[in-house]
UniProtKB/Swiss-Prot annotation:
Gene3D superfamilies linked: Hexapeptide repeat proteins (2.160.10.10), Spore Coat Polysaccharide Biosynthesis Protein SpsA, Chain A (3.90.550.10)
Region (N-acetyltransferase): 251-459
GO molecular function annotation: glucosamine-1-phosphate N-acetyltransferase activity; magnesium ion binding; UDP-N-acetylglucosamine diphosphorylase activity
Any single GO BP term: regulation of cell shape
Region (Pyrophosphorylase): 1-229
Protein name: Bifunctional protein GlmU
Amino acid sequence: MSNFAIILAAGKGTRMKSDLPKVLHKVAGISMLEHVFRSVGAIQPEKTVTVVGHKAELVEEVLAEQTEFVTQSEQLGTGHAVMMTEPILEGLSGHTLVIAGDTPLITGESLKNLIDFHINHKNVATILTAETDNPFGYGRIVRNDNAEVLRIVEQKDATDFEKQIKEINTGTYVFDNERLFEALKNINTNNAQGEYYITDVIGIFRETGEKVGAYTLKDFDESLGVNDRVALATAESVMRRRINHKHMVNGVSFVNPEATYIDIDVEIAPEVQIEANVILKGQTKIGAETVLTNGTYVVDSTIGAGAVITNSMIEESSVADGVTVGPYAHIRPNSSLGAQVHIGNFVEVKGSSIGENTKAGHLTYIGNCEVGSNVNFGAGTITVNYDGKNKYKTVIGDNVFVGSNSTIIAPVELGDNSLVGAGSTITKDVPADAIAIGRGRQINKDEYATRLPHHPKNQ
C-alpha cells in the first residue's frame, strides 16, 4: 500500500513574536519546515500535502514544487487542517502520516519505524509518543489496564489524575487514510479551545472497536515542538550536537564541539581539525587535512585539502588545496584562490581570482582583479576599483612583483614578469618585463629641518 504525508504548516506562531511564519525559522541553516520535509522523505510518500495559512506564499516558496499545497484560511485546529487535504487524499488507499512543520528534530529513521510499527500491528491509527518527567503542556496518552490506548487528552482538558501521566503525544500520527477522512466528518469543537482536534479521531476509532496503537520514541528530544525562541534555541543546540557528533564519527577533530557551529548541509572530509568558535554555514565544503583555527567563519564556500584558515572570514568563494588565509583576512563573495596561495593578516579579497603560489602577506586590498600565478603583493598594496559610480577590473599577469605601499588604479593591466616600484601609483598599463615607477622624486634639503619649530635647536 502507498504512504502519504500531511505536513501542518499553517500556524502564525504568535509566541515567536516574529513577522516570519513559525515553520520558516531556521535550525542549523535550514527552516524547520525543510527539516521535517527531509525526514518525511524516509517513508517515500506517494503524495505529500503541506497545509499553509499565515503568509502562505512565503511557506510555498521554500518547498516550491516538492509538495502539493492546500490553504487553511482560518486556524481552527489540527483536525480542521487535515480536513483541508480532503480534495487530494480522500478515498485513496494507504497509510497517511500527519506531522507538524515545527518539529525539526524528528528523524527519518523514527518516522520509518513509526510507519513499520503501524503496518506490522495492523492499526487503524498509531500515535507517536514520548516519555518525559515534565509533561506540562503536552497532550497525555490515556491507556487502560491492558496498556491499550484509549484516547489523547489535551493539557487544558485533562483531569488532575491525567495530568500526572508521563507519556505524551508528540503530535505525529499515522492513520489508515480512508478511515481518517471518514472519522474527520464526526469530530466537533466541544472542547476548551473550541477547535477541531485531530486527537478526537482516536476516540472515534476506539468507540468503533478499531485498533489504535502507540510507538514510543527512543529519544525524547525528537518530540520537541518549537513554539517560541527558547524552544528554537533548544532545537538549535540539539541539532548542533547531532551534526558535530556525525562529523566526529566520520574522522573530523573538534577542540570544543560545544563551541562550534556547523550547518546541516556542510560537508567535511576526514582529518580536518576544527578549533573552538568556528562557524561553517550554508553549502560549505571542507577538504581533507585542512585546519580551521579559532574564530574562523565560512559561508557557502569550498576549501580544498591541506589548507590553513586562521581566524578569518570566507564568503561564497573557492579556496584551493594548500592555501593559507589569515589571521584577520576577509575573502569576500565571488573570489577564488589557487593552490598554495597565501593571504596574510589584514588582507581583503573581493570578486577576484588569484593564481597559484601568489602571496599577499599583509595590509592589502585586492578587488575586482584577475591575478596570475607567482605574484607578490607588498604590504599596503591597494587596487582601486571604484570611481564613485562604476567598478573596474585590474588584470595582473604571472610573476609580477608589486612593491609595498603601491596603488593600482583600474582599469589597468600589469604584464607578465613586470615590477612595480614601492610607493607607486599606477594609472597606465605596464608592459611585460617592464619596471613601473609612479612616485614623486625624493629631494633632500640640507639643514632645512633646523628652521622648523620641532627641531631641538628651536625648543
